[in-house]
């Protein structure tokens, strides 16, 4: 099943994010078997990071929660809120990316 994992940064976490970026990226590479797509969210026209959005393909909500909890950004407190929502694949157009 697909789940959207929407992570919003806590306030004032730029340095915290930077210091945990390498392990975060390593973690995502290790999750490529379930990670459909993901990336940082930012304010258009600026470099201001707002959080991250991931689509994961896992068997259960608990597995989506485990994905989120295993992320070094989550463990370090980079994210102020994480919302996990089940979703259906309605349109799939990877060539549009």
What does each model-identified segment do?
Residues 1-97:
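Conserved, structured core segments of small domains
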């Amino acid at each position: 099943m697909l789940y959207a994992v929407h992570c919003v940064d806590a306030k004032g976490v730029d340095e915290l994010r930077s210091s945990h970026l390498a392990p975060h990226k390593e973690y995502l590479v290790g999750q490529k078997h379930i990670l459909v797509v993901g990336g940082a969210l930012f304010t258009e026209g600026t470099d201001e990071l707002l959080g991250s959005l991931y689509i994961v393909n896992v068997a259960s909500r608990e597995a989506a929660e485990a994905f989120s909890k295993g992320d070094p950004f989550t463990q370090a407190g980079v994210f102020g809120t994480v919302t996990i929502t089940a979703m259906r694949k309605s349109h799939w157009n990877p060539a549009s990316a």
